[in-house]
Amino acid sequence: MSNQHIEELNDQQIVRREKMAALTEQGIDPFGKRFERTATSGQLNEKYADKSKEDLHDIEETATIAGRLMTKRGKGKVGFAHIQDREGQIQIYVRKDSVGEENYEIFKKADLGDFLGVEGQVMRTDMGELSIKATHITHLSKALRPLPEKFHGLTDIETIYRKRHLDLISNRDSFDRFVTRSKIISEIRRFMDSNGFLEVETPVLHNEAGGASARPFITHHNAQDIDMVLRIATELHLKRLIVGGMERVYEIGRIFRNEGMDATHNPEFTSIEAYQAYADYQDIMDLTEGIIQHVTKTVKGDGPINYQGTEIKINEPFKRVHMVDAVKEITGIDFWKEMTLEEAQALAQEKNVPLEKHFTTVGHIINAFFEEFVEDTLIQPTFVFGHPVEVSPLAKKNDTDPRFTDRFELFVMTKEYANAFTELNDPIDQLSRFEAQASAKELGDDEATGVDYDYVEALEYGMPPTGGLGIGIDRLCMLLTDTTTIRDVLLFPTMK
């Protein structure tokens, strides 16, 4: 520790270090050792919820708990405190004549934030609060910094995101939200495993960005002296496994996209991608609906959910609508009709739809109309299918109308939650679409990808008809925890 650091310590930090030294002089390790507890706060509160003060007095049940000291009050020979563990808090009642002078001094000198082990009898106070009447106290770890202001919790948004450890200590709602996130991911796994899918792991470092339209992070592999990219999707590797005969695979993992940040976007995020041989996009719609309804029922219970004051009927069958029909319903423009690029551009100008340089086909303009007019109207769970082929380089063309693909996106509360399609398994068609993407990249489309010749070669060995799916897990967590920013469901969001 440098002298400069010592000089920067405030009065509280200095006092805490003095107490640390005093513990050492007493032969007590300030940072403790293994401690065996017999119960958590949650277990005790659940087990004795219906027991009165008299009941507990007669039972004479003992318990050993451990956790962080969050409150402390009292004077003389009696004190009260609250110990916090991962399930919540429980009060401890400490009497000098019950724990002994040495033990009582440990309690008396303990600072808020310190970790203590407490053994004692389960009781209920005159006020009705479940408590532990301590018979022995063990010092477990010294906190050298004071906690955030104890009564109001941590409220500074920047600190909440930059110092999540303090947020978790101070804000129980935040702690519970991340427990829910963990349950959501566990339930997704449970659903996929029970439906015969195999969980796999694919590379994070790729030679060529692919599987999505996004700008990648670029890094350098020193040993091979080559530039590589962090994956923007897991798609192309997972489909290689379908070629290899695995038939049903999925991966839950981090994806990296070198793009802007807002309420629903973080440069690194978690997704699930899944691929099922011998299925099409309609089968995958059923799978997607099944995943989301299973997770919602497990985490939130039966019935609709409430998101920011809006009732979402997530327990009912999801609406299904073709993109062209959705655009027609809102704007009155019928893109089913054959039209030239010039006619489509004129319609866009008439409706003030921004036109990008790489919008070189009617399909690009249909997609722009959808994004401009339809997305913000999609509140209830809605599958929008039939995306133009130009914006779906990995999706199979529709048999009836090859201008469109057998692709869908799931929207809830105006946001996209899933993207899926009947996979393109024609290597010749795939190569031409990769080449079209490469051309768009040259015209300035930063999200367009290059040509992955190795993937095309894999397709040439034959891939069965396949349906594929990607779900943004962070957005699903936002929906099911009623939060409005992705930073509230990421333990460590990207910060400037």
Swiss-Prot record:
<keyword id="KW-0460">Magnesium</keyword>
<dbReference type="GO" id="GO:0005829">
    <property type="term" value="C:cytosol"/>
</dbReference>
<dbReference type="InterPro" id="IPR034762">
    <property type="entry name" value="Lys-tRNA-ligase_II_bac/euk"/>
</dbReference>
<keyword id="KW-0067">ATP-binding</keyword>
<dbReference type="InterPro" id="IPR004364">
    <property type="entry name" value="Aa-tRNA-synt_II"/>
</dbReference>
<dbReference type="InterPro" id="IPR006195">
    <property type="entry name" value="aa-tRNA-synth_II"/>
</dbReference>
<dbReference type="GO" id="GO:0005524">
    <property type="term" value="F:ATP binding"/>
</dbReference>
<feature type="binding site">
    <location>
        <position position="409"/>
    </location>
    <ligand>
        <name>Mg(2+) 1</name>
    </ligand>
</feature>
<dbReference type="GO" id="GO:0000287">
    <property type="term" value="F:magnesium ion binding"/>
</dbReference>
<comment type="similarity">
    <text>Belongs to the class-II aminoacyl-tRNA synthetase family.</text>
</comment>
<dbReference type="GO" id="GO:0000049">
    <property type="term" value="F:tRNA binding"/>
</dbReference>
<dbReference type="InterPro" id="IPR004365">
    <property type="entry name" value="NA-bd_OB_tRNA"/>
</dbReference>
<dbReference type="Pfam" id="PF00152">
    <property type="entry name" value="tRNA-synt_2"/>
</dbReference>
<keyword id="KW-0547">Nucleotide-binding</keyword>
<feature type="binding site">
    <location>
        <position position="416"/>
    </location>
    <ligand>
        <name>Mg(2+) 2</name>
    </ligand>
</feature>
<dbReference type="GO" id="GO:0140096">
    <property type="term" value="F:catalytic activity, acting on a protein"/>
</dbReference>
<dbReference type="InterPro" id="IPR012340">
    <property type="entry name" value="NA-bd_OB-fold"/>
</dbReference>
<keyword id="KW-0479">Metal-binding</keyword>
<keyword id="KW-0963">Cytoplasm</keyword>
<dbReference type="GO" id="GO:0006430">
    <property type="term" value="P:lysyl-tRNA aminoacylation"/>
</dbReference>
<dbReference type="Pfam" id="PF01336">
    <property type="entry name" value="tRNA_anti-codon"/>
</dbReference>
<feature type="binding site">
    <location>
        <position position="416"/>
    </location>
    <ligand>
        <name>Mg(2+) 1</name>
    </ligand>
</feature>
<keyword id="KW-0030">Aminoacyl-tRNA synthetase</keyword>
<keyword id="KW-0648">Protein biosynthesis</keyword>
<comment type="subunit">
    <text>Homodimer.</text>
</comment>
<dbReference type="GO" id="GO:0004824">
    <property type="term" value="F:lysine-tRNA ligase activity"/>
</dbReference>
<keyword id="KW-0436">Ligase</keyword>
<dbReference type="GO" id="GO:0016740">
    <property type="term" value="F:transferase activity"/>
</dbReference>
<protein>
    <recommendedName>
        <fullName>Lysine--tRNA ligase</fullName>
        <ecNumber>6.1.1.6</ecNumber>
    </recommendedName>
</protein>
<dbReference type="InterPro" id="IPR018149">
    <property type="entry name" value="Lys-tRNA-synth_II_C"/>
</dbReference>
<dbReference type="InterPro" id="IPR045864">
    <property type="entry name" value="aa-tRNA-synth_II/BPL/LPL"/>
</dbReference>
<dbReference type="InterPro" id="IPR002313">
    <property type="entry name" value="Lys-tRNA-ligase_II"/>
</dbReference>
<dbReference type="InterPro" id="IPR044136">
    <property type="entry name" value="Lys-tRNA-ligase_II_N"/>
</dbReference>
